[in-house]
Amino acid sequence: MYYIGVDLGTSAVKLLLMEGSGKICNIVSKEYPLFFPHPGWSEQNPEDWFTQSMEGIKELTEGIDRKEVAGIGFGGQMHGLVTLDKDDNPFTLSDLLPGSPGSVHAHPWDISFP
C-alpha cells in the first residue's frame, strides 16, 4: 500500500511516494514559472499547477501498481485566488501573496487597524 503527498508551492510542486510503513519510495519536484507583471506583484498560471502535478504523479508512480495507492493528500501555498469561467476553467493568472494587486488596497487597512 502506498500514499502520495503533494505540496503545491510557489516555485514548484513537490511530490512524495511512501509505503504504509512510512518508508519513502520516491520524491519528485516539478517547477513552474512565476510571473512579475508589475513591481511588487507575483502571479502564476493555475494550469501549470495542474499540468506539473499530473506529470509529477506519473513520474512518481513509475514502476509501481497504481492500484496500490491508498491515499493522496494535497497542501499548497495560501492566498492564491483562482478565478474560473462558467466551464470551471481558470481565465486569469492567480495573484499570489506577498506582492499582488490586493496589497495596494490592503495597505490603508494596515494603518487604520494597528
Regions found by a protein language model. Give the residues of each.
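Glycine-rich phosphate-binding loop plus the immediately following alpha-helix
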Residues: 98-114
